[in-house]
Amino acid sequence: MSPQTETKASVGFKAGVKDYKLTYYTPDYETKDTDILAAFRVTPQPGVPPEEAG
């Protein structure tokens, strides 16, 4: 039988929903040589703000 491991609830992701605007932009991010630039055109569904759809 393998040894048991202990899982702590405080490690990892916390439950709940964060405001998307708080998580999608990092103003002090510095690009790296390994970063990949990708562009997508997104059309929001009716009632969804454009910044939330992208």
Curated annotation (Swiss-Prot):
A single GO molecular-function term is: ribulose-bisphosphate carboxylase activity
Q: What's a single GO CC term here?
A: chloroplast
- A Pfam family annotated for this UniProt entry: RuBisCO_large_N
Source taxon at top rank: Eukaryota
Biological process GO terms, please?
Answer: photorespiration; reductive pentose-phosphate cycle
What are the UniProt keywords, alphabetically? Acetylation, Calvin cycle, Carbon dioxide fixation, Chloroplast, Lyase, Methylation, Monooxygenase, Oxidoreductase, Photorespiration, Photosynthesis, Plastid
Q: Which InterPro entries match?
A: RuBisCO (IPR033966), RuBisCO_lsu_fd_N (IPR017443), RuBisCO_lsu_N_sf (IPR036422)
Instruction: Supply the EC number(s).
Output: 4.1.1.39
Which residues does the record list as N-acetylproline (modified residue)? Answer: P3
Catalytic activity line of the entry? 2 (2R)-3-phosphoglycerate + 2 H(+) = D-ribulose 1,5-bisphosphate + CO2 + H2O; D-ribulose 1,5-bisphosphate + O2 = 2-phosphoglycolate + (2R)-3-phosphoglycerate + 2 H(+)
Q: How does it assemble?
A: Heterohexadecamer of 8 large chains and 8 small chains.
Q: What else is known?
A: The basic functional RuBisCO is composed of a large chain homodimer in a 'head-to-tail' conformation. In form I RuBisCO this homodimer is arranged in a barrel-like tetramer with the small subunits forming a tetrameric 'cap' on each end of the 'barrel'.
- List, alphabetically, the PANTHER family matched: RIBULOSE BISPHOSPHATE CARBOXYLASE, RIBULOSE BISPHOSPHATE CARBOXYLASE LARGE CHAIN
Cited function = RuBisCO catalyzes two reactions: the carboxylation of D-ribulose 1,5-bisphosphate, the primary event in carbon dioxide fixation, as well as the oxidative fragmentation of the pentose substrate in the photorespiration process. Both reactions occur simultaneously and in competition at the same active site.
Family under the similarity heading: Belongs to the RuBisCO large chain family. Type I subfamily.
Q: What name appears for this protein in its UniProt entry? A: Ribulose bisphosphate carboxylase large chain
| Species whose genome carries this gene | Icacina mannii
